[in-house]
Amino acid sequence: MATPLPDFETARGGGAVASSSTTVLPSSVSSSSSSSRPLPVANSFSDDAEEISPILIFLFFHKAVCSELEALHRLALEFATGHHVDLRLLRERYRFLRSIYKHHCNAEDEVIFSALDIRVKNVAQTYSLEHKGESNLFDHLFELLNSATETDESYRRELARSTGALQTSVSQHLAKEQKQVFPLLIEKFKYEEQAYIVWRFLCSIPVNMLAVFLPWISSSISVDESKEMQTCLKKIVPGEKLLQQVIFTWLGGKSNTVASCRIEDSMFQCCLDSSSSMLPCKASREQCACEGSKIGKRKYPELTNFGSSDTLHPVDEIKLWHKSINKEMKEIADEARKIQLSGDFSDLSAFDERLQYIAEVCIFHSLAEDKIIFPAVDGEFSFSEEHDEEENQFNEFRCLIENIKSAGASSTSAAEFYTKLCSHADQIMETIQRHFHNEEIQVLPLARKNFSFKRQQELLYQSLCIMPLRLIERVLPWLTASLTEDEAKNFLKNLQAGAPKSDVALVTLFSGWACKGRKAGECLSPNGNGLCPVKTLSNIKEVNLQSCNACASVPCTSRSTKSCCQHQDKRPAKRTAVLSCEKKTTPHSTEVANGCKPSGNGRSCCVPDLGVNNNCLELGSLPAAKAMRSSSLNSAAPALNSSLFIWEMDSNSFGTGHAERPVATIFKFHKAISKDLEFLDVESGKLIDCDGTFIRQFIGRFHLLWGFYKAHSNAEDDILFPALESKETLHNVSHSYTLDHKQEEKLFGDIYSVLTELSILHEKLQSDSMMEDIAQTDTVRTDIDNGDCNKKYNELATKLQGMCKSIKITLDQHIFLEELELWPLFDKHFSIQEQDKIVGRIIGTTGAEVLQSMLPWVTSALSEDEQNRMMDTWKQATKNTMFDEWLNECWKGSPDSSSTETSKPSPQKDNDHQEILDQSGELFKPGWKDIFRMNQNELEAEIRKVYQDSTLDPRRKDYLVQNWRTSRWIAAQQKLPKEAETAVNGDVELGCSPSFRDPEKQIYGCEHYKRNCKLRAACCDQLFTCRFCHDKVSDHSMDRKLVTEMLCMRCLKVQPVGPICTTPSCDGFPMAKHYCSICKLFDDERAVYHCPFCNLCRVGEGLGIDFFHCMTCNCCLGMKLVNHKCLEKSLETNCPICCEFLFTSSEAVRALPCGHYMHSACFQAYTCSHYTCPICGKSLGDMAVYFGMLDALLAAEELPEEYKNRCQDILCNDCERKGTTRFHWLYHKCGSCGSYNTRVIKSETIPPDCSTSS
């Protein structure tokens, strides 16, 4: 399942601005990974065309990776369904892909994301963390591949599932980069900066991998795309011809660096040959971009072979590395002591940079030993523990420096920091010296003994190629600067002799850099007669070589060194914008990274700089080196707390060791989601041999999970993430997770499609099997059809297993990163009250039916303590609502609950609820004989008890008192009609007849509701169509929640209240489209929903659709009123106009700007003559036009002479400020807000200047 590259709009020129939120990349790379369609803009990189963003070259890599993942997963599926597949070849191709992808990710972390984080915060960290998750997937896959048991069917399926999960995860990650990262890079960086970033990216990949990386991409894309890639590289690689030759030699696959650096030719070749868009003999057909239109004959000089007559063994050069590193560490330790003595912070950044440099050198040196030297030696040597210890010590050292920087010079702990600084420096130096000594006495003697002179030279060259170009450019002059002249010359001899002949340009570059470490760039060749490759390169003869714009600069020739070096400084214009900043030098690299310095003897070497160590964008390098070393040793992903960026250091400092916050309850849903994902993953393995019942149950569980996941992701996208983004420091932090939700929703949809097809196929197979049993025929045609169906069913079942595995891994990774990155942000940036509001906002958009299903689903995945904490948080967020009452009624009415107290979730709450029910039974349905026996004093005593009960709501008290006072009359009314009815009609009940909403059409119901039943009122035991019909003819109100019986108006049978008629003759006749078991509400006409927080049924589509419940106001509001002014329990009052209780009113209610409410009809009538709130007196809307009219009126009005100098003190009802204004008999304008909604608080005569406010 390859992820197609999105259609992007061409981003031209320097820093093209993205349209909307996503910049579109060229359609030339928009074809899917499996497409070989020619590119429509193959010449868009030409000099005549407008410039296209260099960032787009990454799309070629994405396409190559997606194509290879798709091809490998297809092989794994074939293997799982019984086809023959060479597992060895599959394993090698995956190993190659992993190596390529790992180095790409490391370079991305070092360069791309570091650069992006400079301009756009809160984006890079998520993608870096995803790299670690993908590394874990590769680890798991290789565990399977290394334990191959081809005969085990479960192994085959697990392999297919794992390859599918890897493909899905990587494809989604790359697609997100294309939608978010690339557009941001194009938008925020100029063209020259983009080219610099891509060039530094290439220079940050180890040389031995870059030699594989470029030709593999080129072989994985179409011919036109390959040409476009070459043209793009011309614009990216600096114009110096030597650099162009190095890169395009690799791109054409002409270099032997791959073979020389222990990357198997067979593995590389098999990956090239198996690529879906492999171009045979590509190197022979496609020219290097530095060559002309015709392939010329190029005569490369033979690299000087200095023979092996020297007594020194080349492998002893490892001691030179050790010596230089020890020297540098000693200088660092001395510098630390100087800082301690002086207490000067000014050089701390330079000190930190120097430490980073030597740490990177040590890490790559250790990597070279682990991957090149030690495996070649026959002895079983491993210094991985020493290497890990050194890396950890360097990391601790850098963290200490960061702490010193953050503490500041005035810190009282500065002295302690400096002491630790010296101690750490001495400790690292001691560790390194001990480690180097052990290597020199254990490993080097065996290497001298077992390897020929030539082999030792080759190993040294391979070790150097473990480093990236960016580091080699700094290391070689640094190393040669610390050597004697003889040591430096021998080092250069061995370097040149150990390289393959095809690497002439690369060795030339290395040699020139090495010479820069000597005084005045002195050439290190034994004499000045041209043996130095930098000099001999100028003798290259080109036949029929046409000039190339990308290679316009002339290499160093026999001209004067001065003119050569002057020419080197003439870099292409596109680089000057980036490289014009001042070069930074560190104490260890003075005069080393400054390019060549001509000398008078004409023997200086001049080669071009890469231009990436002048770090204008301040990109890091050490973290990528650490990541490479970690992954190379034990194939495990780096620890999550090994920072890729400095700002990650405190990423784990939140969320642990603190009391659980309200928002944590939202993340409790992650546990339930993970539990169901595990269920789908495991149970999907049983789909091949199962019955129809199992498939139906599996589909049901899948739909349940899909629904709850959708509700959860919508809550995050609509509420949680916008809350995070509202904080200025957290912009962009959630965009990646929003993209995850869209991708995961598509995965659910894909699974649903396959599951539906699988279910239909299973039914067909069962039907065919039954038909065969009946007909007892066994024709050849039937056998063929059944065989094809069974084969297709097995393929679909295997595919579905992989998809379930993929969605489990994808969602688990998504959940893990959310909890790691986003969860701590709520504790850091949101107060408890803000978190309560967020929780209330989320559950306030969740309907009763969803909550009723969701709560048991979530709590089943939690411990008892977690359940209690979650419910406490929910009740705190809903403290102003009826949620607790609804919760009790739901648990009481649950079909799974019994009448016993022990089966109820909350015994204490149920006891309270039972007490209310007992009181209700005693107060609302008394026996009439008992009522008649109560005297007036006893009745008054009961009423006083109600008034004194502080646990009762005031509305409840009024209702109970009213019923007590009318109880004698109610009892009499209950007795007399029953007796009369019994005397006249025997068992016939009053009202036992149908009523009609539309008598002509025979539609059941009443004037208030369309429904097919009547309700028996608990208060008077009579049948009424609805409570309004009851209240209309009675002097008391009907409590519909106490209704237990109903009458079906079709069969006229009284039965327990429910959604359908239980009489057999009615055959499940529905009482209404909407039935609420709590409110006992039936409505067959309107859209109605039950709000669990109002604990009432309201007209509307539902919470989260067209309404939400505000937990502060305790009312349901339209979705457009999200940003309203809250007043606690504002709807639990009477309408200020008609005095009807608003909370239970069925009429439309209008929210006023001040936060109060009134009926919409009352508002219309009231505003005909008033414009202020009848409760608080504030203006009911924007009165600017009206106030402007009053301004004009007063301006035209002239006061009598005796009132002109009189002023009045006023209080503004709108802004609540006091002020002074000129006298008027009616209108007084507020000097602060300009409102005329004011009142006079004092009148007096003062000087004319009286237009003030306070």
Swiss-Prot record:
List of residues binding Zn(2+) 5: 1091, 1094, 1109, 1116
Biological or metabolic pathway of the protein: Protein modification; protein ubiquitination
A biological process from GO: cellular response to hypoxia
Zinc finger (RING-type) stretch: 1135-1176
Localization per record: Membrane; Nucleus
Keyword Lipid biosynthesis on entry: no
PROSITE patterns named among the record's database cross-references: ZF_CHY (PS51266), ZF_CTCHY (PS51270), ZF_RING_2 (PS50089)
Effect listed in the UniProt record for changing residue 716 to A: Normal sensitivity to iron
GO molecular function: iron ion binding; ligase activity; ubiquitin protein ligase activity; zinc ion binding
UniProt-annotated stretches for the region Disordered: 1-40, 893-913
Chain positions of all zinc fingers (CHY-type): 999-1068
Tissue-wise expression: Expressed in cotyledons of seedlings, young leaves, developing and mature embryos, and other reproductive tissues including floral vasculature, funiculus, septum, and gynoecium valves.
Entries under Pfam families matching the protein: Hemerythrin (PF01814), zf-CHY (PF05495), zf-RING_2 (PF13639), zinc_ribbon_6 (PF14599)
Annotated protein name in UniProt: Zinc finger protein BRUTUS
UniProt source species: Arabidopsis thaliana (Mouse-ear cress)
Gene that this polypeptide is encoded by: BTS
